[in-house]
């Protein structure tokens, strides 16, 4: 039996479709015959239902995965307020310990063939005074998939994020263009520019360009993603 694969999903900003793309990837992996699970290790913004605290992003990931992880493994740190996690954690008296997340990820790898780990916010979102989301990806040792919210300014945001990923020694396995502004002029030209720059500077392929969907459908979006290309990149990046 081959070792499980895993990837870390980050984005150019918050609210640009990381959960949507992560869910679409889960559908694609399941269609490829893989047992696919998801982690949202740090989630900020919770609601109470049936006496338990839940998070909408984590719920969406659970709905897309064909392997359900225990909540304590899927989301080791569930914060109540929807704000910057290090600020909320300090106010709620929670220490966002990266080691705890690494242990949870190790356990998740025992339950599935592929694990999608969705980060919180962008790649440099602080988790503590001196640790950020990129440090988490480094500790997990995972290749990164970058979700680019296609809107005005996305070229600079994407290239800066890719530089931050490379600066930590993390492989950029690929990127996804997610059209969050349906009225954006020259969207295709922006995507073409990013395709050329990210391929040239980081050898990061475009995994798919997702049309704006209302309402969003991760299952439908999964058909626009090149899951086999991503799987090959993950296998190439896996420890020998």
Curated annotation (Swiss-Prot):
Stretch forming the signal peptide: none
Q: Where does Mg(2+) bind?
A: 19, 57, 118
Q: Which reactions does this protein catalyse?
A: (7R,8S)-7,8-diammoniononanoate + CO2 + ATP = (4R,5S)-dethiobiotin + ADP + phosphate + 3 H(+)
List keywords of the entry alphabetically: ATP-binding, Biotin biosynthesis, Cytoplasm, Ligase, Magnesium, Metal-binding, Nucleotide-binding
The question of whether ATP-binding is a record keyword is answered with yes
Show the CDD domains listed in the entry: DTBS (cd03109)
Q: In which pathway does it act?
A: Cofactor biosynthesis; biotin biosynthesis; biotin from 7,8-diaminononanoate: step 1/2
Residues engaged in binding ATP: 15-20, 57, 118-121, 178-179
Q: Where is the active site?
A: 40
Record localization: Cytoplasm
The record's section on PANTHER family has: DETHIOBIOTIN SYNTHETASE (PTHR43210:SF5)
Q: What is this protein called?
A: ATP-dependent dethiobiotin synthetase BioD
